[in-house]
Curated annotation (Swiss-Prot):
Cofactors, names only: Zn(2+)
Lineage: Eukaryota, Fungi, Dikarya, Ascomycota, Pezizomycotina
InterPro entries given in the database record: Fungal_M35_metalloproteases, MetalloPept_cat_dom_sf, Peptidase_M35
GO biological process annotation, one example: proteolysis
Binding site for Zn(2+): H304, H308, D319
GO cellular component assignments: extracellular region
GO molecular function, one term: metal ion binding
Transmembrane segments: none
Main location class: secreted
Record family assignment: Belongs to the peptidase M35 family.
Name of the protein described by the UniProt record: Neutral protease 2 homolog AO090001000135
């Protein structure tokens, strides 16, 4: 990992989502997403509450989020098209009202976005689009569970020339303008977080490889030796990446160089560039290490972000289930690619949850 002590001016990004459908047994509530084409690569999503009760959910990392998060998955000839945007880690308590959406039964919200701004579709041709996953639901501005969403499968024919003309949301500018340095308390906090990440990841890797089978089953939904080896390998890769501040595959900024932090975002990753950036909230909201099972802290947030970066371990993880209740509702194949599952498992190993 290359630790960046001087920020640089950067431009914008665009949408992120789950390529894997999430099944939640026995869930009476749900959100139905209807996708339609309104332009060559411009997509409209209508999200409907199909349940019988009002539901309040976090729309960050979902439709209505103005940040470049993944809202749909794209496929060409059954192969997923690379997404070039951000993956955000959010707070789970004290969420601001503007991060929440309440839908009455049968009510809808709409969102429009251009998929060519966040994926290279200049090749044109037939693209298949869908969107499935889990959305955190809240009570009194605190995440208390999750609700599943699923969409129709939409197939569109993309005009290559028109798609190529769409402005890319993610642009890494030349480092001509130096902004504030990472120093003082923030530098100290991040250095401590990295040291703690090394310890947590290494302990979790050992536990994954040869520790309690019941704990591994709780988080990863299997005890197969191949899955345990894969989890251990990813966690060891995270430990190795966090151990060096002068080399490695990622670049870590201690401040919001992209301008995508909000009052609810702790940190974010640009997987396509292997870049991680912390938000102000990372320092003001999170303890260095929590003493509470399943709670957030700086070390597990950094660990969470490292798992997103494919340069650390490929493929990078997604955000398929956020928080303990959603993460432990995933299947084994989904848990293996879910960032929060690794953070929660490391926390559980550290605190003997």
């Amino acid at each position: 990992m290359r630790f960046i002590s001087v920020s640089s001016l950067l431009l914008a990004l665009a949408p992120a989502l789950n390529a894997v459908p999430v099944e939640v047994a026995g869930s009476a509530q749900g959100l139905d997403v209807t996708l339609s084409q309104v332009g060559n690569t411009r997509i409209k999503a209508v999200v409907k509450n199909t349940g019988s009760e009002d539901v309040t959910f976090v729309h960050l990392n979902f439709f209505k989020d103005a940040a470049p998060v993944q809202k749909v998955s794209l496929f060409r000839n059954a192969t997923e098209v690379q997404f070039q945007g951000i993956k955000q880690r959010l707070i789970t308590e004290g969420l601001s009202d503007d991060a929440l959406t309440t839908l009455a039964p049968g009510a809808t919200i709409e969102d429009e976005f251009d998929i060519a701004s966040t994926s290279d579709l200049s090749e044109g041709g037939t693209i298949t689009i869908n969107s499935n996953g889990l959305v955190p639901i809240t009570t009194d501005n605190k995440v208390t569970g999750y609700i599943p969403f699923t969409s129709n499968e939409l197939s569109i024919d993309v005009d290559a020339a028109e798609a190529a003309s769409v402005t890319q949301a993610v642009k890494i500018l030349e480092r001509r303008t130096k902004v504030t340095s990472c120093s003082g308390s923030r530098l100290s906090a991040l250095q401590t977080a990295l040291r703690n990440t090394v310890s947590l990841a290494r302990a979790a890797a050992t536990a994954a490889q040869s520790g309690s089978s019941s704990r591994f089953q709780e988080y990863f939904k299997t005890t197969s030796s191949s899955t345990r080896s894969t989890v251990a390998a990813r966690l060891n890769a995270v430990a190795n990446e966090a151990a060096s501040t002068s080399s490695g595959s990622t670049t870590y900024y201690c401040s919001d160089v992209y301008g995508y932090c909000s009052s609810n975002v702790l940190a974010y990753t640009l997987p396509s560039y292997n870049i991680i950036a912390n938000c102000d909230l990372y320092y003001s909201y999170l303890p260095a290490l929590t003493s509470t099972c399943h709670a957030q802290d700086q070390a597990t947030t950094t660990l969470h972000e490292f798992t997103h970066a494919p340069g650390v371990y490929s493929p990078g993880t997604d955000d398929l289930g956020y928080g303990y209740s959603a993460a432990t509702a995933l299947s084994a194949s989904q848990a293996l690619l879910n960032a929060d599952t690794y953070a929660l498992f490391a926390n559980a190993v550290n605190l003997n949850c």
